[in-house]
């Protein structure tokens, strides 16, 4: 029976939380999209990855309720709405509406908001989200092309886009342990607080949350909360090693595809270009006629194939600085340019798969999503972590291994380390 069912709002976020579940003792399978009603899976945790982070609230709600219905059919005991640790959601965002819809469908009146991931520098203090030593609103996320985060107060952000009031469990209460947190949640529930932000400064706070929230029907947050919940649900750690083993990367030709324009991905691309062959994507050529786009995709695939025997996999990147990105969006439009680049990456990936490439390292949630769909991968095993929240994964049905990285995750040497430390 599935103990924990996770509804993740993007592909890289799904692999992020799946890796934390596996590494903390809970065997996990990730599903790419909602499977048919008769699809069965034998595991203790399931992560359903959607592509709802940047879409309209209406579409995100519909997709999330569809995922919830499948998990309910499987007899799932606890539900987890997973979003980014930087709470990617503006005043018109969909985290609030999705949370409201899930609460209503489950007949619940309260849930928690816990995006923190201290190991990656995401902490919550007095209800405000920090990235390292900066308020979220003063970090690189304020320049995000789709969800610019200009307010660090999670209670205020939540109330702007959701239907209820939002309270807080401050760090002083969190320090007192699970019983104190439960008591505070009960008090806030009596006061009509539909959502409760949880201060989180360290991993012990995540463990406390896991213990306190074991019986809450719906929880919401980033991947950090999974650390505590997995340890509450896990029977033992014996199954963890076998689950990780199933996801280890296999040998074969590889490629790095980078569609993210985050601060860290810019650093990673610049660092990798000093070690490996790289080629920048020409956005203008992505927006030409269909025949021209096909020709460009073939040209790029041929370039990658020419480097298939290199010591490090070749890199194709659309990664650009905030200034360059602003110019691109001003000239061609944010949505049009983003869609065109994703379509190109998908076409290149398809050609490389047909030519026997079996290892794909991908930076960016949207890029990861469309490439995984194009490669025909519906489910995969979670393998060893390259960086916190970024594991290697292996298709359950195809000879394909992938590393799907959220924009700001990983260190500067991520692309090379993913290959060197996990050589098959």
Curated annotation (Swiss-Prot):
Keywords recorded for this protein, A-Z: ATP-binding, Carbohydrate metabolism, Kinase, Nucleotide-binding, Transferase
Family: Belongs to the four-carbon acid sugar kinase family.
Entry's EC annotation: 2.7.1.217
Catalytically driven reaction(s): 3-dehydro-L-erythronate + ATP = 3-dehydro-4-O-phospho-L-erythronate + ADP + H(+); 3-dehydro-D-erythronate + ATP = 3-dehydro-4-O-phospho-D-erythronate + ADP + H(+)
One annotated GO molecular function: ATP binding
One Pfam family hit: SBD_N
The keyword Transferase belongs to this UniProt entry's keyword annotation: yes
Enzyme class at the top of the EC tree: transferase
Name of the protein in its database record: 3-oxo-tetronate kinase
Record has Cell inner membrane as a keyword: no
Organism in which the protein naturally occurs: Pectobacterium atrosepticum (strain SCRI 1043 / ATCC BAA-672)
């Amino acid at each position: 029976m599935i103990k924990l069912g996770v509804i993740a709002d993007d592909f890289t976020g799904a692999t992020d939380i799946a890796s934390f579940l596996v590494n903390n003792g809970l065997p996990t399978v990730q599903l790419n999209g909602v499977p048919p009603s008769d699809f069965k899976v034998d595991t203790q945790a399931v992560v359903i990855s959607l592509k709802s982070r940047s879409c309209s609230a209406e579409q995100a709600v519909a997709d999330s309720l569809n995922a919830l219905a499948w998990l309910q059919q499987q007899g799932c005991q606890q539900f987890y709405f997973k979003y980014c640790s930087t709470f990617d959601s503006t005043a018109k965002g969909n985290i609030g509406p999705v949370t409201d819809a899930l609460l209503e469908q489950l007949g619940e009146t309260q849930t928690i908001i816990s995006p923190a991931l201290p190991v990656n520098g995401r902490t919550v203090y007095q209800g405000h989200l920090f990235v390292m030593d900066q308020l979220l609103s003063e970090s690189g996320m304020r320049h995000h092309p789709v969800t610019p985060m200009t307010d660090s107060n999670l209670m205020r952000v939540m109330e702007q886009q959701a239907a209820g009031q939002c309270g807080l469990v401050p760090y002083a209460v969190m320090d007192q342990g699970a019983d104190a947190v439960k008591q505070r949640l009960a008090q806030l529930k009596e006061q009509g607080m539909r959502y409760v932000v949880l201060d989180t400064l360290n991993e012990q706070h995540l463990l406390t949350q896991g213990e306190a929230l074991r019986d809450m029907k719906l929880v919401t947050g980033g991947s950090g909360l999974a650390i505590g919940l997995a340890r509450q649900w896990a029977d033992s750690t014996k199954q963890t090693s076998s689950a990780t083993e199933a996801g280890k990367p296999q040998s074969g030709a590889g490629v790095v595809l980078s569609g993210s324009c985050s601060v860290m991905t810019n650093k990673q691309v610049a660092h990798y270009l000093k070690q490996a062959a790289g080629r920048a994507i020409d956005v203008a050529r992505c927006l030409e006629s269909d025949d021209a786009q096909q020709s460009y995709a073939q040209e790029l695939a041929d370039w990658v194939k020419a480097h298939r025997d290199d010591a490090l996999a070749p890199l194709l990147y659309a990664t650009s600085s905030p200034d360059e990105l602003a110019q691109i969006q001003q000239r061609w439009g944010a949505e049009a340019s983003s869609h065109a680049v994703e379509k190109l990456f998908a076409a290149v990936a398809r050609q490389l798969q047909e030519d026997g490439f079996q290892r794909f390292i991908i930076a960016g949630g949207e890029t990861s999503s469309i490439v995984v769909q194009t490669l025909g991968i519906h489910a995969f095993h979670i393998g060893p972590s390259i960086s916190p929240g970024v594991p290697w994964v292996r298709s359950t049905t195809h000879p394909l291994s992938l590393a799907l990285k959220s924009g700001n995750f990983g260190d500067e040497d991520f692309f090379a380390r993913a290959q060197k430390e996990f050589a098959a």
